[in-house]
Swiss-Prot record:
Disulfide bonds join C73-C119. It comes from Klebsiella pneumoniae. The active site is at S66, E164. GO terms for molecular function: beta-lactamase activity. This is Beta-lactamase SHV-2. It comes from the Bacteria. Keywords: Antibiotic resistance, Disulfide bond, Hydrolase, Plasmid, Signal. The gene is bla. Substrate binds at K230, T231, G232. The keyword Disulfide bond applies. Belongs to the class-A beta-lactamase family.
Length: 286
């Protein structure tokens, strides 16, 4: 019997801590779900190893909303690396090409924008028309989904254009991902050979320059910490963020948080995501 116990202990000692987490971050998530009367999906992943550090509903589907724009620009950069696209190429468009919330692209109807400028607008300002113009260059929603399949993401799917993709109907699988799939895809884009080192740096810099994520994790970030992120929002009870975080101004972990099916206001959704981020950071610093 003593031999059996020793074998069990030895076996347990070798098991990976793939989904282990302290109660504190998970307790905050449970509280957020209760206060939001909705669902929260979250994953915290080590950037270097891909190991999952914390997870909650990580394999459930959530609307991507504008977080898809990071993957979109990753697909654009893959085309640049392949010689099929140039960041300096100018794209011209018309008034009828503009959709709601296009704070950058609406100012350049006369002169157009380069592919690189459109990516910057899509990520840093979440410009919807910029995203649609870029989406057209990769073959539309079906083309972006095909890119995801090519890099090994068999879960994430884009079905519609801006702004319909933000509809976030309960139970609708269109335009969704899972926290685990989004984190794994982001890690592939930023650390594997899917993109050149130059394109990886460019994608990360666009996320660093995000100007519309202030009320979320950036609001609780300690001094000297690194963050690069992209948010998403829907009028129908959803919110999300994909981020890279780390102390000493270094990206060390990927954090993906999605909310759905909540009647809470946008301010409350922001507050809850910030609270989850704060709990993760506090646990990290222990």
């Amino acid at each position: 019997m003593r031999y059996i116990r020793l074998c069990i202990i030895s076996l347990l000692a070798t098991l990976p801590l793939a989904v282990h987490a302290s109660p504190q971050p998970l307790e905050q998530i449970k509280q957020s779900e209760s206060q939001l009367s909705g669902r929260v999906g979250m994953i915290e992943m080590d950037l270097a190893s891909g190991r999952t550090l914390t997870a909650w509903r990580a394999d459930e589907r959530f609307p991507m909303m504008s977080t898809f724009k990071v993957v979109l620009c990753g697909a654009v950069l893959a085309r640049v690396d392949a010689g099929d696209e140039q960041l300096e190429r100018k794209i011209h468009y018309r008034q009828q090409d503009l959709v709601d919330y296009s704070p950058v692209s609406e100012k350049h109807l006369a002169d157009g924008m380069t592919v690189g400028e459109l990516c910057a607008a899509a990520i840093t300002m979440s410009d919807n028309s910029a995203a649609n113009l870029l989406l057209a260059t990769v073959g539309g929603p079906a083309g972006l989904t095909a890119f995801l399949r090519q890099i090994g993401d068999n879960v994430t799917r884009l079905d519609r254009w801006e702004t319909e993709l933000n509809e976030a109907l309960p139970g609708d699988a269109r335009d969704t991902t899972t926290p685990a799939s989004m984190a794994a895809t982001l890690r592939k884009l930023l650390t594997s050979q899917r993109l050149s080192a130059r394109s990886q740096r460019q994608l990360l810099q666009w996320m660093v320059d995000d100007r519309v994520a202030g009320p979320l994790i950036r609001s609780v970030l300690p001094a000297g910490w690194f963050i690069a992120d992209k948010t998403g929002a829907s009028e129908r009870g959803a919110r999300g963020i994909v981020a890279l975080l780390g102390p000493n101004n270094k990206a060390e972990r990927i954090v993906v948080i999605y909310l759905r099916d909540t009647p809470a206001s946008m301010a409350e959704r922001n507050q809850q995501i910030a609270g989850i981020g704060a709990a993760l950071i506090e646990h990290w610093q222990r």
